[in-house]
Every structure is written in structure tokens, then in C-alpha cells.
Amino acid sequence: MRILHTADWHLGKTLEGRSRLPEQEAVIDEIVEIVQKENIDVVLLAGDAFDTVNPPADAEKLFYEALSRLSDYGKRHVAVIAGNHDHPGRLSAAAPIAEKHAITLLGFPTDRVQQIHVPSSDETLMIGALPYPSESRLNELLAEECDEALLRARYDERIRAIFAKMNESFREDAVNIAMSHLYVAGGATCDSERPIELGGAYTVSPASFPASAQYVALGHLHRPQDVKHAAMPARYAGSPLAYSFSEAGYSKSVTIIDVQPRCAPIISEYLLSKGRPLVKWKATEGLAQVYRWIEEGRDRDAWIDLEIDVEQSLTLEETHRLRKLYDGFVHIRPNYIKKEEVVRDVRTDVPIETLFTRFYERQTGGGKPSEQLVQLFLQLVAEEDEQ
């Protein structure tokens, strides 16, 4: 049996107001091609199909079209669970219709194992699928005290109990897979992930996975990575696109699992190539260097985070020219190389209103604060000194 594991599509997500939907369409086309080329029997989507609980209509349309194509219109099984970004009720609302087309949609946590006959391999697949299990979605209060360590221990115990219940339904004559959307201790995070719980209270130990699972398919972390210290192969497939500049330089992929009953799986990573990469530029030679890079066509198809060394603030005209020359600039961040001189000014007898005016000019690209604003600032400073 060949299983493709993907996760964290985040359909509808934007990058500083820029739509990523065309890129998401392209990478879904690529995943569909991989499924067909690699003769995949089952597709698993481990949560965060959408970026918000109320996704735009175009994102929902793309999602259901993708499921239809991945299932080959009912010939291949596809299983989807809700992540922390998904609305569990909304995701599972279409489950009765989807089930008739070999698509399983699970929104709320459950300990019931899904039994699936896979005609293409003539084998049975048992999926212990656990959608994102928050306290509210579990409909349980795990700890009344505001004790993070206690909540973390209780949460891990609860997830372990759910997986243990699933383990009872796993069979030796079937392929046994667990799937969930959660944070496992030790995972490498990045900026585009919304924390599951502040402080890390919703953290699960790899020892909590069902003992008889041959593979654990995970979602939530956007960097593809194996889970350390698990008793069986467990992996985050990662997001198919880079969604923050903290992911710059990281490859994106889907995971393919070749597995038979009672046998250890063979895990392989299939790299993805679609979508615009996220790239960081550091221009230490100022604007001239940036103009040269643009003329050379450097990273022409990328989204770019630009940090540029300057002695004076960039004018609005200079900023507009950069964006006109290349629409891929997401951030343009001036780095003032005379910052040390500014710091020294603070230690001298330069009037506070002069320092404020300089700061305002740097922050606004050359703008001048009004006299009313300067007086308000001085008033606030005086009040702070009185305290």
C-alpha cells in the first residue's frame, strides 16, 4: 500500500495582504500529479486545510476540487482531519456527501478508528485519526488550576488515553496508521504557525502515540521533519508552501509511505517545486546594490524581505521605485548604519525634542512631526519624570 501524507495547506492565506491562491492552485496541481505518477492508494491530509475558520469562497472551492481530483472522483480514498485553523463543524458538514466519494472528513476529536478497504492494493487500512484536540473541542476541562505544568501533564495523559483506545482497534492483518494535528515535544517551529496554546501546555510526548501504529502522520509544524524519540516512524509532512520568511531556504515536500501489514514502512520524501520561494536580501552596499540585483534578475519569481543599509531614510519616491521595478518586495526595511551615532546622541546634551524629531524622521522616511505632536511628546515625558 502506498500512502501520501500532506498537511497544512492553509488555503486562503495571504502574505502581508498578497493572495497566495494562485500558488496554492499550482502546488495542488503538483500534488495531484505526484499521486497519479506514484500510484498512490490513499491520501492523508493532517489538518489546517484552511487558514481561518471562515475561509473565502475561492479557498473552499479549491479545497473541494482538490479532494475530488485526489480521490480520482471516488476511486482513491482521501482522509482529512481538522487542524487548529479549521472550523471542525464546517469541515465535517460535507462528510455525508464526501463519504460517498471515498473522502473522509473528520472535524471533532474521536477515538474511533476508521476502517477502509483499499481496492487498489486489496488491503485493509485502519486509521486512528484524531483531529486537533483542544480542551474546547474535546469538551473537557483538563485542569481547573492555572498551573501550566499540571495542564500539560493532564493534556498528555488525555491524548495518550485516546491513542490507547485507538490501539485496541488496530489489527495485525491490516495496515495501522495514526494521524493527528498537534504539537509533539521537540518539534522545530517557525513564525507562520499559530501556537496551539500559549506556554506550550498543549504539548504531547512521542511516547503517547498508539503502540501498534506503523506510522504517525502529523500536521501543525510547517517544516518537514521526523519526530525524535518515537517508537515508530512519526513525521510532520510540513506545509506545501513557505508561509513566513522564517522558512526561507527550506525545501517543501510531501511524504510517501510504502507499508504492508506487520512490516516496517519505507518512508520517502518527495520534494515540491511550485509556488514562489520566500527569500531574504541583505543589501550592505545600499540602493545601488539592490538596483543591480533587480537588473540581473536575481530571485525574479520570489517574495523578498529586503534589508538595506542606508545613511539616511529612504524617500517615498525611492520606495515606490523599488516596488515598481519588482512587485516581489514584501518588506523593505532600512538599516541605518549611523545608528551608533544616534545612540551616542542620547548620552549627550542633545535636547529631547530634537531626538524625538530625528526618530520621527527615520520612522516616517523623512516626515516632520507637527508642533502639536512634539508638545504632546514632551508632556508625556514630563508626566513620566514626575512619576
Predicted regions: what they are:
Residues 8, 28, 48, 63, ...:
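Divalent metal-coordination and catalytic microenvironments
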Residues 37, 42, 259-387:
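Accessory, non-catalytic peripheral segments of nucleic-acid enzymes
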Residues 6-7, 43-48, 77-84, 104-109, ...:
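Active-site neighborhood of phospho(di)ester-bond hydrolases with catalytic His/Asp-centered motifs
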Residues 184-186, 190-258, 263:
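Conserved beta-sheet core of the metallophosphoesterase superfamily
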Residues 10, 40-58, 75-89, 184-200:
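Active-site neighborhood of divalent metal-dependent phosphoester/pyrophosphate hydrolases
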Residues 14-16, 49-66, 82-101, 107, ...:
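Metal-dependent catalytic neighborhoods of phosphoester/phosphodiester hydrolases
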Residues 93-200:
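Conserved catalytic scaffold of divalent metal-dependent phosphoesterases
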Residues 1-68, 75, 375, 379-383, ...:
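N-terminal active-site segment of His-dependent metallophosphoesterases
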